[in-house]
């Protein structure tokens, strides 16, 4: 089983937010998972879907019936494999980055493009960390199929500053994954938004460089993984409202700045990709 062990980060963005530094000490990050796959978790008779955990998704119709006007492929899928109470704030960001209200999809389409999304959420009042399945062991059939049918995948995660090898209280996002172009665009957009960001290297779970990591199981075999520290995620929601039930209705400007930065990076990447 792979767990988070070593992380070294390099500064890539946002001087106004302070430098991360070019080298950070090794840290022990995430304890070994209780479940070695989603399949094992779903098979546990002690867990009840809809009570302990839930899954949400939206997959857009691709209808290619006209040989003279072929439909474009699914460009990007946004995922939160540890949403709800596991890594707080990632469900709401997943929805917003996909183009929806953080409270969930509605019949009214917002401005801008919509993306497919998938998320796994811890629904317990406590103890949700036991539901964490590391990204290289992700095998939910629907989630994996959605990623495999997309050109790009953006995967959202949460970590503590200590797990990231940062100073206490650091509000930052670590950019990982095998899509170097998307990583570059994300870094540039975070810098423009004044959000502290760094390229994640070293430990695979945070760096997201293993081919089996769900962020890289796209049509192109590469994607992006974003690890947001607890402090960065907390600053996105009103004080006292950073709970699973309250977050969606209590977002702060930083939430939307982060969302806009990721959406702009995705749009820049999609503009370079062929229609089909």
Regions inferred by a protein language model and the residue ranges of each:
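N-terminal secretory signal peptides and thylakoid transit peptides that target proteins
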Residues: 1-15
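N-terminal catalytic or cofactor-binding beta/alpha core of small enzyme domains
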Residues: 11-275
């Amino acid at each position: 089983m792979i767990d988070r062990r070593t992380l070294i980060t390099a500064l890539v963005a946002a001087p106004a937010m302070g430098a991360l530094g070019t080298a950070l000490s090794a840290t022990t990050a995430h304890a070994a998972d209780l479940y070695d796959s989603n399949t094992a978790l779903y098979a546990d008779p002690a867990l009840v879907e809809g009570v302990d955990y839930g899954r949400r998704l939206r997959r857009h119709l691709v209808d290619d019936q006209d040989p003279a006007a072929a439909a474009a492929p699914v460009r990007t899928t946004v995922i939160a494999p540890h949403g709800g109470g596991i890594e707080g704030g990632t469900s709401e960001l997943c929805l917003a980055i996909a183009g929806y209200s953080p409270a969930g999809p509605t019949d009214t389409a917002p401005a801008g493009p919509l993306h497919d999304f998938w998320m796994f959420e811890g629904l317990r009042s406590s103890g949700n960390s036991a539901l964490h399945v590391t990204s290289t062991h992700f095998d939910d059939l629907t989630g994996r199929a959605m990623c495999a049918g997309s050109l790009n995948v953006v995967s959202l995660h949460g970590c503590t500053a200590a797990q990231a090898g940062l100073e206490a209280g650091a509000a930052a996002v670590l950019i990982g994954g095998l899509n170097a172009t998307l990583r570059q665009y994300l870094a540039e957009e975070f810098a423009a938004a004044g959000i502290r960001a760094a390229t994640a290297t070293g430990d695979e779970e945070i760096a997201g460089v293993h081919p089996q990591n769900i962020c890289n199981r796209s049509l192109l075999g590469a994607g992006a993984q974003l690890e947001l520290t607890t402090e960065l995620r907390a600053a996105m929601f009103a004080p006292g409202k950073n709970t699973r039930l309250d977050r969606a209705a209590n977002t702060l400007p930083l939430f939307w700045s982060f969302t806009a930065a990721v959406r702009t990076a995705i749009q820049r990447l999609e503009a370079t990709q062929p229609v089909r």
